[in-house]
């Protein structure tokens, strides 16, 4: 099987005509997408960064008096 089977919308069908899965289970959720661990890591870093900005802002001027 040299070429990929694709539907009219460009997606790979779930099953081949003989009933076997069209894509191996190892690549089922990662083909053409970002790995979930990478998205989660970037999201976690972004959350920590935003919280850091809020904490920094909340302590700006504390003790300055005036």
Curated annotation (Swiss-Prot):
Gene3D superfamilies: 6.10.250.2070. It comes from the Bacteria. Keywords: Membrane, Photosynthesis, Photosystem II, Reaction center, Thylakoid, Transmembrane, Transmembrane helix. One of its GO terms (biological process) is photosynthesis. It is a single-pass membrane protein. SUPFAM superfamilies: Photosystem II reaction center protein J, PsbJ. It is found in: Cellular thylakoid membrane. It holds the Pfam family PsbJ. The chain crosses the membrane at residues 36-56. One of the components of the core complex of photosystem II (PSII). PSII is a light-driven water:plastoquinone oxidoreductase that uses light energy to abstract electrons from H(2)O, generating O(2) and a proton gradient subsequently used for ATP formation. It consists of a core antenna complex that captures photons, and an electron transfer chain that converts photonic excitation into a charge separation. PANTHER family: PHOTOSYSTEM II REACTION CENTER PROTEIN J (PTHR34812:SF3). Belongs to the PsbJ family. This is Photosystem II reaction center protein J. It comes from Prochlorococcus marinus (strain MIT 9215). The lineage of its organism: Bacteria, Bacillati, Cyanobacteriota, Cyanophyceae, Synechococcales. The gene is psbJ.
């Amino acid at each position: 099987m040299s070429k990929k089977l694709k539907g009219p919308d460009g997606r790979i069908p779930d099953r081949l005509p003989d009933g076997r899965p069209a894509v191996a289970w190892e690549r089922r959720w990662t083909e053409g997408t970002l790995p979930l661990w990478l998205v989660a890591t970037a999201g976690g870093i972004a959350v920590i960064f935003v919280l850091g900005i809020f904490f920094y802002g909340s302590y700006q001027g504390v003790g300055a008096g005036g």
